[in-house]
Amino acid sequence: MQAKHQRLILGIIALAAVIAAGFLALVAFKKQAAYFFTPTDAVKAHLPANRNIRLGGMVERGSLIREKDGVTIHFRVTDGYQKIAVSYRGIVPDLFREGSGVVADGHFDPSGSFTAETILAKHDERYMPPVTQQQAAATQTTLQEK
């Protein structure tokens, strides 16, 4: 009877540990989750300051300003309807440029400006490096000549 009692207590402790671990994982995931918003969605949502989100859209042409320190940039993200000013301090991806797609991971400050901790430059699925484009063009020309 005592062995049965010990197994029951051990089972209850193991179940409690699994539930506690699951709860802690859920809380940690919720804190790390960053939802994707377009500028229009972000304006409509009236997001609280310091809530991490992913802001996606196009870098507005003529909005990119580089600071003299070489690592800070300011630009506007637009979806064609709304524009949101973004500040970022860090290394800029090679594909980042005006008129291209971008996803900025960060938060709104109490002043209402968006501070990005990371930025991802997006490209369309048809992107090919210049060398590959040249090789494809040469192959196409060769095939047309035959």
Curated annotation (Swiss-Prot):
Gene Ontology cellular-component annotations: plasma membrane
- The stretches that face the Periplasmic side, renumbered to this chain, are 29-146
Q: Which residues lie on this side of the membrane: Cytoplasmic?
A: 1-7
What InterPro entries does the record point to? CcmE (IPR004329), CcmE-like_sf (IPR036127), NA-bd_OB-fold (IPR012340)
Q: Which keywords belong to this entry?
A: Cell inner membrane, Cell membrane, Cytochrome c-type biogenesis, Heme, Iron, Membrane, Metal-binding, Signal-anchor, Transmembrane, Transmembrane helix
Residues holding heme: H123, Y127
Tell me if Glycoprotein is a UniProt keyword of this record: no
Q: Any idea which GO molecular function terms this record carries?
A: heme binding; metal ion binding
| Membrane topology note | Single-pass type II membrane protein
Q: Which Pfam families match?
A: CcmE
Looking at the UniProt entry, the stretches that span the membrane are 8-28
Question: Principal place where this protein is found?
Answer: membrane
Q: Where in the cell is it found?
A: Cell inner membrane
Q: Name one GO biological process term.
A: cytochrome complex assembly
Q: Which HAMAP family match?
A: CcmE
| Record's function text | Heme chaperone required for the biogenesis of c-type cytochromes. Transiently binds heme delivered by CcmC and transfers the heme to apo-cytochromes in a process facilitated by CcmF and CcmH.
- PANTHER family given for it? CYTOCHROME C-TYPE BIOGENESIS PROTEIN CCME HOMOLOG, MITOCHONDRIAL
Query: Which family, according to UniProt?
Result: Belongs to the CcmE/CycJ family.
User: What is the protein named?
Assistant: Cytochrome c-type biogenesis protein CcmE
